[in-house]
């Protein structure tokens, strides 16, 4: 049904957002160490 599709999409988006956040966090930490 529609509910399961929504759940699936929400999971996918959450995974992508987490990946992007991890990338940004790593960049931020690296920049802080460079200073």
Swiss-Prot record:
Residues bearing PTM Glutamic acid 1-amide: 35
GO cellular component: extracellular region
Keyword DNA-binding: no
GO biological process, one term: killing of cells of another organism
Database matches in Pfam families: Cu
Keywords for this protein: Amidation, Antibiotic, Antimicrobial, Cytolysis, Hemolysis, Neurotoxin, Secreted, Toxin
Subcellular localization: Secreted
Tissue expression notes: Expressed by the venom gland.
Extent of the signal sequence: none
InterPro entries registered for this protein in UniProt: Cupiennin
Molecular function GO labels: toxin activity
Family indicated by similarity: Belongs to the cationic peptide 04 (cupiennin) family. 01 subfamily.
Protein's job: Has antimicrobial activity against B.subtilis, E.coli, E.faecalis, P.aeruginosa, and S.aureus. Has insecticidal and hemolytic activities. Probably acts by disturbing membrane function with its amphipathic structure.
Record-given protein name: Cupiennin-1d
Top-level taxonomy: Eukaryota, Metazoa, Ecdysozoa, Arthropoda, Chelicerata
